[in-house]
Amino acid sequence: SPAMPVPGPMGPMGPRGPPGSPGASGPQGFGPAGPPGKNGEDGESGKPGRGGERGPPGPQGARGFSGLDGAKGDSGPAGPKGESGAPGENGTPGAMGPRGAAGAAGARGNDGAAGAAGPPGPTGPAGPPGFPGGPGAKGDAGAQGGRGPEGPAGARGEPGNPGPAGAAGPSGNPGTDGAAGPKGTPGAAGVAGAPGFPGPRGPSGPQGAAGAPGPKGEAGAKGEAGAPGVQGPPGPSGEEGKRGARGEPGAAGARGGPGGRGFPGTDGPAGPKGATGERGAPGAVGPKGATGEPGRTGEPGLPGAKGMTGSPGSPGPDGKTGPAGPSGQDGRPGPPGPVGARGQPGVMGFPGPKGAAGEGGKPGERGPSGPAGPAGERGEQGPAGAPGFQGLPGPQGALGETGKPGEQGLPGEAGATGPAGARGDRGFPGERGAKGDAGAPGAPGAQGPPGLQGMPGERGAAGLPGLRGDRGDQGAKGADGAPGKDGPRGLTGPLGLPGPAGATGDKGESGPAGAVGPAGARGAPGERGESGPPGPAGFAGPPGADGQPGAKGEAGDNGAKGDAGPPGAAGPTGAPGPQGPVGNTGAKGARATGFPGAAGRVGPPGPSGNPGPPGPAGGPGKEGPKGNRGETGPAGRPGELGAAGPPGPAGEKGSPGSEGATGSAGLPGPQGLAGQRGLPGQRGERGFPGLPGPSGEAGGPSGPGGERGPPGPMGPPGLAGAPGEPGREGSPGNEGSAGRDGAAGPKGDRGESGPSGAPGAPGPPGAPGPVGPAGKNGDRGETGPAGPAGSAGPSGPRGPAGAPGLRGDKGESGEAGERRGFTGMQGPPGPSGSSGEQGPAGAAGPAGPRGPAGSAGSPGKDGMSGLPGPTGPPGPRSGEMGPAGPPGPPGPPGAPGAPGGGFDLGFLSQPQEKAPDPFRDRDLEVDSTLKSLSQQLEQLRSPDGTRSKPEDVNLQLTFLRNSVAYMDASAGNLKKATSRLPLLDLAPMDVGAPDQEFGLEVGPVCFL
């Protein structure tokens, strides 16, 4: 049979064939999703996306560090006055102040022993003239005198009887105008003028100080959302990788900059005890030690320098009346007697020459204001005012509407993939991962620079005192310290034991008399002590006080006649005196008679014409002849009161009246203005000593001993040591020789007054004091015996002419003269002629008497402020301090004022006519204040003579009365507000001597 092919064993595997073509896709499997694959490597960072929309505001950050201090801002305006702080602790005591002013005079000391009589004083001034003596006894008849010289020619005889009347002369020319008459009485005050136009706008004031920075504004409202950005191309979304493992710690970074100023740390624990410090500076003077035992009595000091001459003692008692002096010379003629009765009118004189032109009259009083003028043209525009203060921030505006969203843009075409870019910027940090494990601590960094000094922490509580340190080795002796400053004056130590009496010093001059001390309470009588040895002679005591007035002395002799005193003030006109003797014949008159006129016949009387207007006053006619002496007329009425004479000299100051009863206490006045800030208070007392410092470090080893230095200066005396135990009594030593006088020690503090010494022997008489003031006039002495008649004085001046004597009897006719007499004077006027034509109008007559005052007009409009008046006369030097007023309510804080200059008080002196009271209801407190003020004003106007209100005070309150007025709403009239100004009148004598300049600065005035 044909051989059957038998399969051989499998051959080796052939090589791999080429891949077949892909099969068709299998059906979609439905298995569950497999687990996510492992993270791939981080891809390269994509390009940064476009900025997203603005996120919502983040949470409030932690508080930042304090910034550096800003520059100093401008000073803000003064704030309102704060409430008074609590009183500070007392400061350390100040240095000893300068010596205080002399204290008030001490009380009067006891009367000293009477001094020896001084030498007679200088001759005093002549006493006042004595009273005239009585008439002396009639003298013996003198020897017959020789014949006197021929007397002067007698006075001219009286003129003869008047001759017959001559014919009427022609009418004289009119006389010259008379001198201007006296100024008429001022007319009534004019009506107040209309108010003036407003003044031009004043220049702008200086720019005010910058205001304080305003408070920080509130946070603004959240801004609107921005418009949506353009949509970016969509990025490929990678899955977020898991957080990688924590990396190794990096190398130490570069040294950081100094950190910001940290907050103050809490107090650290107390550090270890430090090394001993260097020796500290000498400490402050410790508190005064206990008073040491009294020192030994010092050596007597050198005699003091001669004291100053004491002030003159008070005048001694009046001496006895001296013997009568010789008669003085006749005094000067006395003052003129009182005005006599008014004489009869004299004869008409000649016309005098034309008088000189009178001085210009005083300017008339201010006339009434004229009618208002027409309105002026409109003024130019004034300059721009200063910029105003910055306004307050306005209210927050309303929110605007939200904008409409923009339209969406078209998507762009996809671009070709670009090449891979460079590595992008670091992406934004992912959300915060969980906290990793703590890494190993890094190596310590280099020490940073010291930070800024932190603010000091609060003061820690005082630590417990450390344990007492070991005592250090004794250091080398330090150099002598400078003597410490004088400590504060210690309290007065107890009185030491009295030392032995010092050597008697040179006798000083008498000291001034002390003032009288207050009488002490009477002590109980002590037991009688043993009589001590007489003390050394004391200084002469001050002169005693004036003794009681002595008994009335015997009448002294008349003193010398004094000089005539100055004429007194004219007294009131007396009643008419008795008729005086006939006066001497007057001198011969001038002879100026006219020529004789022909005697006219007397015409028949004409009918009486109409009275013409008064003609101008004719000139005075010539002097007529002296008529026969008339009979004595009846006594005239008392003359008018003469003009006041010059003021007499000031009278002596009267003695003060007895003290009046104490008035009831006034009501409290209104509160005064706030005073200026007071001076700083005195330095407070010394603080307590501080805690002891830690013990110092042991000093170095002692150096080799130096050579002994020269002795150092004497150190300040140490504090008194504690008293040692008493030693045993030593045996008495030999008496040493007296040491040299020591230098005078510094002046010690004033000791307390010692007990009074025994009265000393009278000292030598002091130098004569200055002449004491003249004593008061003594009582009027009794009339002394008549003195011898004085020699005749020179004849006095010719007295005034007496009143005309009684009319004498008619004399017998004289013999015919040798020559014919002068032609007689013009005869009396004839009877009236027929009426003439009406004459020209006469000159205006003198002003008539002032009419009665019209009824009060309604109050005028406000007048313009008057000019400042003159400064008033000086007020008294010192007023009494008024009672404290009730505290007022605190005022609102004022705006800061502009710096003010001084201004003149004088503006108050003009009356301001109208100031309506802004507050109608006046409360009780104001009423009571007004009442007490008016009482005080009344006491000032009529003082009661007590020491606090003497009678001769002249207070110038007039300006105060006229200064201010207010409207009384109830009655509707103006009242002077005498009590509404919170200041009294000031006069220059209140602020210094009359020749000193002084200024015043017055703040704004508040009305009640």
From Swiss-Prot:
Q: What is its main location?
A: secreted
Give me the stretches of Gly residues compositional bias. 133-151, 253-265, 696-709
Q: Where is this region: Disordered?
A: 1-920
Per its UniProt record, what Pfam families does this chain match?
Answer: COLFI, Collagen
Q: Which UniProt keywords apply?
A: Collagen, Extracellular matrix, Secreted
Cellular compartment(s): Secreted, Extracellular space, Extracellular matrix
Task: Cite the record's Low complexity compositional bias ranges.
Answer: 92-117, 152-195, 204-230, 339-354, 410-422, 437-456, 489-524, 537-573, 634-661, 717-735, 785-806, 832-868
Q: Locate the compositionally biased regions of type Basic and acidic residues.
A: 39-53, 423-435, 807-821
Among the GO molecular function terms of this UniProt record, one is: extracellular matrix structural constituent
Q: Which residues form the Fibrillar collagen NC1 domain?
A: 978-1008
Gene Ontology cellular component list: collagen trimer; extracellular region
Classification via InterPro entries: Collagen (IPR008160), Collagen_Structural_Proteins (IPR050938), Fib_collagen_C (IPR000885)
Composition bias (Pro residues) maps to 1-21, 119-132, 604-617, 761-771, 884-896
The record ties this protein, via PANTHER family, to: COLLAGEN ALPHA-1(XXIII) CHAIN-LIKE ISOFORM X2, SI:CH211-266K2.1
Q: Which family does it belong to?
A: Belongs to the fibrillar collagen family.
Please give the name of this protein.
Answer: Collagen, type I, alpha 1a
Supply the source organism's classification.
Eukaryota, Metazoa, Chordata, Craniata, Vertebrata
